[in-house]
Amino acid sequence: MLGAVFLLLFWPWTVIGQEKKEAQSLTVFAAASLTVPLQKITTAYTETGAGRVDLSFAASSTLARQIAAGAPCDIFISADRAWMDHLIEEGLITPENRRNLLGNALVMVAPLDSRGESASEDIQPTLNLSPRFGLEGEIMAILGSGRIAMGDPAYVPAGIYGREALMSLGVWMNLRHRLIPTANDRLATVLVERGEAPLGIVYASDSHTSHALRLVAAFPQSSHTPIVYPLGLISDSAAVRDFRDFLFSEKASAIFTGSGFQTIEFLSGNR
């Protein structure tokens, strides 16, 4: 009898506790270029005793379309502002729940060569990317019969930035036929790492965390639209806000900068 009373007294509280724990789990859709740091940050976050965080990585365009189609998601981190703007226009994210999280840069990379130089080391670029006579020929000489791996410029943010940069340098028209367009930036990085492409145009963060690449050149910041990663809340619960705040913490910022990103919380207009 006492055992039955004990169960009646404590069983409901156990269920409530389980429901509370389940309610703390959340889903984050993030640009593929954020894979390495977000996995580390999520591990650090869950070690604090917080709920589970499920991560889904893909091209920002793919994720935005999935969200618009009704895919369950609590936080969206895009690699460009256009797709975040799209979800705001669709009424899925409110302007007050949008905040700029990170910045990035664009670089040209090649497979690690016999000198053992990697893009993550502090080495001098081997190519001067400035609008000048002969630049196209120098790039073609490195390419040989190969192609440039980069995100698809039709919809992948990294590819869109890459197209802007090549157009700014005056070499897009001829190089556009020498591309391997990929579904996201990480795939372009992998193709170069494997030696399947002699050159790649990727984010500086991807080259920073790779030990199989060497830096060929850094694109001038003025050659493309500023690379900004906005964060938006799809749902607005205490657990979602808690993880959002953790992403802006000093611990998370250290992981982001250690992965080659630029933190931009101090920029004006970042809410």
Provide a role label for each language-model segment.
Residues 2-12:
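Bacterial N-terminal signal peptides
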Residues 13-61, 65-71, 78-81, 85-271:
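Exported/periplasmic ABC-transporter solute-binding proteins
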